[in-house]
């Protein structure tokens, strides 16, 4: 049986990306809000509060996490575009997911945020001509991260978390 933590597999980057790969990853990022919205559509509060696996997050926590994570990524892109390889501050995503608002807030709050955030993010990304993809930030644990690699990562990240919700729905017959 495959690992339920990674329903689409672990992230892998073999860069540099082809033009076709970049286009696909841009499309993935652009569609993350609508894909997540479709994945959670019609779920009851009880279903939204059901972990996708033992010890895993609930669809509610997943929705709030994707908003938290993608806000951080958007800011990291801006930092990398305006500073020379800035060192970013990581955040404790598992602890953020345990905060009361991540466990109880209506998911529409984060879905609406993602809609607006991704519109802004795509306006930025669609303007990239070439050199911007090579710009980077430094992650204290992972080292330098080019914006090209980060594009691939967040394409995967959105699909990964949507798959958490859709695999739960499939498993539970929802």
Residue locations for each model-derived region?
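Generic anion/oxyanion-binding catalytic loop in active/binding sites
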Residues: 25, 51, 99, 110, ...
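Short, contiguous, helix-prone interaction/anchoring segments in small proteins
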Residues: 20-53
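Solvent-exposed interaction patches of small proteins and small membrane subunits
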Residues: 17-27, 83, 104-105, 112, ...
